[in-house]
Amino acid sequence: DDDRPGRLDGSYVAGKFGNWIFSLGQQERWWGSGWEGSLILSNNARPVPTFSIDRAVSEPFETKWLNWIGPWRLTTFVGQMEGSRDDYDHPLFWGMRVSARPLDGLEISLERTAQLCGEGRSCTWDDFWNMFSGNDNAGENVDPEDEPGNQLASWDIRWASPIGDWNYA
């Protein structure tokens, strides 16, 4: 508990540019196909204040080489977490989710989140690139104490049955 008179949870301000939505706010996110649980992001914890970029309308690529992916969606965000932590105060929290519907009723998604930077840790574009590309994983020429962040990755598949009103996740 704290002495704050109010919270901004669930609020945001957004603008649209082409097929992209840019927003600032504290939006709850539920990443995963399950209705009762999510492996990577859920509304179990309070939302982090973030800057987000989302694809507004899910449409297939126009090129014949990528059209088979079907309608696709991308969302990414970055925000700064709170201080007074046991690890590093004020780390950045980054996430990205890409989903596609190659067939009617079938959705495939890939998700990734990472905590990086924070007080007392390096925070450069190289650090972000090493995290994004997987070059910073412990055991990959990086000692655990030098690993610049904590990462999670997930994938999920959701299929809506053409018979009845059944969904499988």
Model-based region annotation:
Residues 7-8, 32-39, 80-83:
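Short acidic, glycine/Ser/Thr-rich loop/turn "cap" segments at secondary-structure junctions
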Residues 1-26, 52-55:
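Beta-barrel outer-membrane channel/assembly domains of diderm bacteria
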Residues 30, 50-169:
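Signature for the C-terminal beta-barrel architecture of outer-membrane proteins
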Residues 5, 39-40, 90-95:
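Short secondary-structure boundary/capping segments
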Residues 2-5, 9, 42-49, 146-153:
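Phosphate/oxyanion-binding active-site loops and adjacent basic polyanion-contact surfaces
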Residues 22, 27-50:
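Aromatic-lined, polymer-binding surfaces characteristic
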